[in-house]
């Protein structure tokens, strides 16, 4: 708490550069509190406050190929009960959609499933009475192609997955009235018989995050 969003942006950028990364995939997003409910927040100049979450959307480039990862952490190091409830709902969708990806599945099918799951989550969280109104709290697609460009070129956005493709999975819920914005994004490689999560080593469960933050405080 007390740090500016741009200080954490700089910390990530510095660590990438110090490990030999020449370029980032895009400008790092560090969005605290209500700022995390803005999809492509770019200011990164607000003060971080205890009790809020901070959403990171970041990625490095390696041999011209890009990563695109989102994680959401509690600034205090501990999720509140409500934050944990919303976070776990998003994480469940993240994991279910990742497990759905395989050759032959279409992006339309993937989005339909994600929309249904997030709508159900909104109802169970007390945000909505009708899951069909999910766009109030989730207003983007489940992912995009990833490669030489962060949003890699696909002529038709509704396509069928084939081995060798890389696609992001990034469900989110954005609740301005509660200053909660959560997105969990992984990069998924489509294989011959399923998929591989290329970003599986990036911690994302509540327990992993709280344990990591208890041992690695930035003062």
Predicted regions and their residues:
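Active-site neighborhoods and metal-handling regions in enzymes and metal-associated proteins
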Residues: 1-219
């Amino acid at each position: 708490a007390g740090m500016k969003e741009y200080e954490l942006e700089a910390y990530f950028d510095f660590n990438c550069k110090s490990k030999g990364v020449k370029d980032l995939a895009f400008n790092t997003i560090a969005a605290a509190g209500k700022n995390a409910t803005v999809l492509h927040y770019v200011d990164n100049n607000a003060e971080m406050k205890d009790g809020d979450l901070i959403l990171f959307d970041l990625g490095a480039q390696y041999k011209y190929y890009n990563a695109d990862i989102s994680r959401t952490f509690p600034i205090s190091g501990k999720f509140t009960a409500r934050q944990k409830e919303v976070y776990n709902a998003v994480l469940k969708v993240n994991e279910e959609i990742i497990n759905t990806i395989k050759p032959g599945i279409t992006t339309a099918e993937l989005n339909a499933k994600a929309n249904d799951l997030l709508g159900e989550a909104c109802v169970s969280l007390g945000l909505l009475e009708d899951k069909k109104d999910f766009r109030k709290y989730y207003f983007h697609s489940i992912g995009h192609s990833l490669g030489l460009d962060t949003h890699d070129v696909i002529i038709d956005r509704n396509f069928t997955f084939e081995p060798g493709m890389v696609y992001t999975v990034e469900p989110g819920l954005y609740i301005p009235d509660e200053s909660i914005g959560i997105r969990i994004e992984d990069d998924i490689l489509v294989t011959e018989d399923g998929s591989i999560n290329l970003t599986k080593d990036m911690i994302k469960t509540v327990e992993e995050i709280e344990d990591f933050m208890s041992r690695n405080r930035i003062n």
